[in-house]
């Protein structure tokens, strides 16, 4: 399939004449995007129940705290009480699709309906103007989970048990209230303040969904290292959150993810195999009770996996204050520091990629859908797909087109809707195109030498938290610089970016379709079918 349509060029002059095309379902045009300044009507509201007044009437926006795919988080001060808060300002122009708009609405709904909890960040208010949606929330200024652990110096199994109990309690509270988080990872937990006894809080509900008992989901979302096997199989429920919490616990105890490889497909295969390594240091120092809990949280069969309440009832969690208080050694702290810094490096690279992911790339796919949808019903039949692929120059044979159709047709209606079609095209085009990585590499290669050297890496990782230690730079260089010449070349950089990267930081829609594409690959090469034969579990396609 290497020659599928990697070089496809869409010719707008080739589209059907004298036909008024309707937009494909699920991919409505962005109502906030007005590049020519011709808007003559008020924009639609993203959050119907948001405050009608201006946010500046109530709050003072200060310095920037962080930046994401859709907007910027600012320090925010209540004019009357002087309380310090955080304001996440989401740019409407960056909500490119109806799916993006729905994501924001759902995040606000979930944060508004969850009961107050000491370990969940509180949404204080929402405001909306013509340009932005503003979410005013509790301020968490105590730093990320791993950064705090590294800074403390003394790190023990008892400390890991305390963190695990907090995360399990958040999961339990979400599930009791019909919320599946779907994106649990260390970066989504911040400490409220810098005090030693500060509360740890869950901060990001952007991929969360409401669920009913027995309801199953098919959308592939989340972050690579933390995905449960049933997510890759597109047939899952709230048990995925316990799996993700188990991955975090494994990392807390030994400093590295349980399922790792140099490519996303390798990570996915490791997750499907589900083999846990308890032989490397420091596992010999860790209690059998802790290992038992990790195994039960990372049980590949979701029907046998512990629930969040059962995690909280486990003896290791119940006796957290009695867990071994012996330091796990510098090896775990140094691994956690390297893991945290590597994530920071990837986040900076993804920010560069996000700025170069043009809306035109997605427009090409939209236009291809319109071109192939001969009867304008918002769906593409097998015959339309076959004819359309031939029209744009694809050399795919009949068996391969049939396989693509079968695997991508998630709802089994014999046709592809827009979302399913996007998955097929990304699968064929391999949207991780070289230009995106090249732009990010050039951002770090300040002197244009063709290499990222130690000082350039140090500069890239220096932020409001200060400069990284020499040991961290050395560790990252050691891992990424595979030819051991003391610098990172372009090929080594690409390998790093393809291993376990959270692509949602570049584009949430891109991430969704990317992992759907990965699922297609695994199904096509038989990996999932082999896994099912070994485990007796089935995949819902």
From Swiss-Prot:
Its EC number is 2.7.11.1. The active site is at 183 (proton acceptor). It comes from the Eukaryota. Highly expressed in root. Activated by calcium. Autophosphorylation may play an important role in the regulation of the kinase activity. GO terms for biological process: abscisic acid-activated signaling pathway. SUPFAM superfamilies: EF-hand, Protein kinase-like (PK-like). Ca(2+) 4 binds at residues 481, 483, 485, 487, 492. It is found in: Membrane. Induction: Induced by ABA, IAA, 2,4-D, GA(3) and 6-BA treatment. Residues 59-317 form the Protein kinase domain. GO terms for molecular function: ATP binding; calcium ion binding; protein kinase activity; protein serine kinase activity; protein serine/threonine kinase activity. Residues 18-28 have a biased composition (Basic residues). It catalyses: L-seryl-[protein] + ATP = O-phospho-L-seryl-[protein] + ADP + H(+); L-threonyl-[protein] + ATP = O-phospho-L-threonyl-[protein] + ADP + H(+). There are 3 contiguous domains conserved in the CDPK subfamily: a kinase domain, an autoinhibitory (junction) domain and a calmodulin-like domain. The autoinhibitory domain (323-353) inactivates kinase activity under calcium-free conditions. This is Calcium-dependent protein kinase 30. The lineage of its organism: Eukaryota, Viridiplantae, Streptophyta, Embryophyta, Tracheophyta.
């Amino acid at each position: 399939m290497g020659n599928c349509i990697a070089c496809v060029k869409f010719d707008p002059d080739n589209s059907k004449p004298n036909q008024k095309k309707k937009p494909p379902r699920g991919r409505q045009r962005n109502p906030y995007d007005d590049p020519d300044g011709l808007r003559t009507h008020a924009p639609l509201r993203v959050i119907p129940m948001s405050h009608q007044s201006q946010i500046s009437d109530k709050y003072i926006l200060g310095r920037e705290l962080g930046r994401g795919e859709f907007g910027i988080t600012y320090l925010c001060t209540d004019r009357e009480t002087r309380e310090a808060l955080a304001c996440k300002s989401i740019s409407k122009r960056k909500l490119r699709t109806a799916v993006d708009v729905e994501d924001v609405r759902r995040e606000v709904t979930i944060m508004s309906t969850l009961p107050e909890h000491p370990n969940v960040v509180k949404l204080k208010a929402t405001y909306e103007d013509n340009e932005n949606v503003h979410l005013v929330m509790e301020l968490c200024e105590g730093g990320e989970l791993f950064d705090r652990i590294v800074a403390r110096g003394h790190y023990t199994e008892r400390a890991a048990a305390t963190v695990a109990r907090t995360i399990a309690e958040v999961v339990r509270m979400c599930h009791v209230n019909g919320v599946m988080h779907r994106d649990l990872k260390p970066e989504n937990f911040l400490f409220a303040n810098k005090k030693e006894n500060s509360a740890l809080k869950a901060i990001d509900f952007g991929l969360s969904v409401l669920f009913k008992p027995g309801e199953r989901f098919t959308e592939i979302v989340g972050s690579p290292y933390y995905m449960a096997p049933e997510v890759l199989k597109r047939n899952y429920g709230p048990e995925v959150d316990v799996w993700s919490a188990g991955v975090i616990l494994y990392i807390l105890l030994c400093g590295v993810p349980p399922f790792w490889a140099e490519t996303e497909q390798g990570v996915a295969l490791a997750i499907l195999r589900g083999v846990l390594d308890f032989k490397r240091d420091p596992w010999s120092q860790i209690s059998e009770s802790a290992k038992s809990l990790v195994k039960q949280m990372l049980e590949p069969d979701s029907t046998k996996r512990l629930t969040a309440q059962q995690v909280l009832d486990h003896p290791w969690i119940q006796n957290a204050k009695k867990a071994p208080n012996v330091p796990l050694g510098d090896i775990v702290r140094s691994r956690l520091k390297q893991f945290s810094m590597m994530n920071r490096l990837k986040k900076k690279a993804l920010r560069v990629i996000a700025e170069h992911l043009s809306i035109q790339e997605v427009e090409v796919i939209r236009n291809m859908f319109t071109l192939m949808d001969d009867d304008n019903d918002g769906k593409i039949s097998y015959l339309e797909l076959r004819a359309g692929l031939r029209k744009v120059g694809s050399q795919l044979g009949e068996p391969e087109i049939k396989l693509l159709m079968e695997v991508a047709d998630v709802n089994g209606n014999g046709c592809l809707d827009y979302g399913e079609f996007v998955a097929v095209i990304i699968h064929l085009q391999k949207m991780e195109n070289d230009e995106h990585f090249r732009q990010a590499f050039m951002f770090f290669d300040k002197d244009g030498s063709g290499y990222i050297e130690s000082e350039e890496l140090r500069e890239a990782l220096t932020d409001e938290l200060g400069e990284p230690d020499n040991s961290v730079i050395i560790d990252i260089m050691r891992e990424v610089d595979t030819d051991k010449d003391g610098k990172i070349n372009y090929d080594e950089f690409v390998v790093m970016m393809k291993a376990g990267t959270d692509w949602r930081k570049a584009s949430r829609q891109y991430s969704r379709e990317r992992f759907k594409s990965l699922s297609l690959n695994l199904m096509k090469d038989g990996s999932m079918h082999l896994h099912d034969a070994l485990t007796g579990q089935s995949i819902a396609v």
